Structures are given as structure tokens and as C-alpha cells.
Amino acid sequence: MRILVSNDDGYFAPGIAALAEALQEVGDVTVVAPERDRSAASNSLTLDRPLSLRRAANGFHFVNGTPTDCVHLAVTGMLDHLPDMVVSGVNHGANMGDDTIYSGTVAAATEGFLLGVPAIAVSLVSKAATDFSAAARVARDLAERFTRIPFQHPVLLNVNVPDRPYEELRGLRVTRLGKRHKAEPVIRSVTPRNETVYWVGAAGQAADAGEGTDFQAVAEGFVSVTPLQIDLTHNGLIPSVAEWIGR
């Protein structure tokens, strides 16, 4: 199995190193990741300048672009064959609920999915963690499952792993996305040159962490596996909007 690995934390991040090592047990791994941290880059593509592709000493490839750039470039311009799977991560921090809208980790997997490849985004639910081995093993397990029981159509899975040893994980739970409260306000600051600058505030706390959510699963020690889709249409509002337009 040919596996394309990417992330949004950069090619030097410990999470992607652990992920690539674990996935080598189930397939031929190629790593193409951003040259620097591109967290919260979402699904952005770089259109205002050319991209460069370079190879690091450890064999990883890195691109001066976004996570989406990395997967798009690899699949459409670098690799000789379409990968059998795209795996993005392991992200240093959760990607649950509304996080998925902004996440570069999820975006890299989404780009693979859009290009017709089954894809998984894997995140470790901790900003303080230094051991990514459990999350990497979960990714390996899921990739191995794909080889044994392939889906008939490409699938996009968002996976969040509690920060605990692999042996202490309570299993996998298929979930829906929860929802966060709105983000904290931006933080105003003044530089030594007396310039006013702003830092984006922290993500909001969970507003919907109820039954069936990714938040609940992780809090209870389960790995959250959420199937995602691309269609943003609010089908339930189509009749109401049509009536409103027709007035």
C-alpha cells in the first residue's frame, strides 16, 4: 500500500516522524509536509507564487506552502502513482468540533479525499504532549484495517486520540462533531516600536460535548473517529430560503 503522509505542524514536527515510522509497518510511506508550522491554514492553496519542493536529510519532502498545497502537489505533480491513502498528522492538539473548519491537519486529509483518495486526519488531544506513539499506532491500526476491509468509495475520517498510553485507550468510537463556544477575543498588544498588534484568541470551550460527540468520546478515554463530508449545503433550509426568495 502506498501512503502519502502530511501535516500542518511542519516536516520537522515529532508527530509526523512518529506517524511515518508507524505507517512503514503497513505500507510504502512518502512524506510531503510544509517547511514551517502552518496550523489553522485550513484548505488554502497558494496561487500568488510558485511552490518549491525540497528533500530533507531524513528523506522527508517539504514545501514552502500550506498543507493543502503539499497534498495537491504530491498527488498531481510529484508521485508516479495515485496513493492508496493519505494520512495527515499527528497533530499537536485536538481537532474536534469547529476546529475542523480551520485545521490544516484536516485540510491535508480533505485534499486527498477531494482527489479521490481515502484519507485520515489524526490528532493527539494535548498541547503539552511529547509522546505521539499511541496516536501513531492508532493511525497504523486504521491503515491496516483499510488494507483488510477497504471502503467501496473514498472516505474522510477525522480521528482524535486521548493523551494516554496505547494500552490505556478504551477503544474506537464513531462520533459526530461537537461544537465549541465562540473563540476568545483577539488580544491587543503594543510592540517596542509602539505599533499596535493583535493575537488571535484561544478557541472556545466545548458548547456541545453531549451524547455521540467527539468531545465526549475523548473525555471518556475513547479514540474518536468522525466521518466527514465536503458538501456544505444546508438542505433543511432550502425550502425556507426558496420561499423567502420568492416573496
UniProtKB/Swiss-Prot annotation:
Keywords carried by this UniProt record: Cytoplasm, Hydrolase, Metal-binding, Nucleotide-binding
Keyword Lyase: no
Paired cysteines (S-S): none
Cofactor: a divalent metal cation
Chief location of this protein within or outside the cell: cytoplasm
InterPro entries, per database record: SurE, SurE-like_Pase/nucleotidase, SurE-like_sf
Reaction(s) this enzyme catalyzes, per UniProt: a ribonucleoside 5'-phosphate + H2O = a ribonucleoside + phosphate
Subcellular compartments: Cytoplasm
Gene Ontology MF annotations: 3'-nucleotidase activity; 5'-nucleotidase activity; exopolyphosphatase activity; metal ion binding; nucleotide binding
Assigned protein family: Belongs to the SurE nucleotidase family.
Protein name: 5'-nucleotidase SurE
Organism: Aromatoleum aromaticum (strain DSM 19018 / LMG 30748 / EbN1)
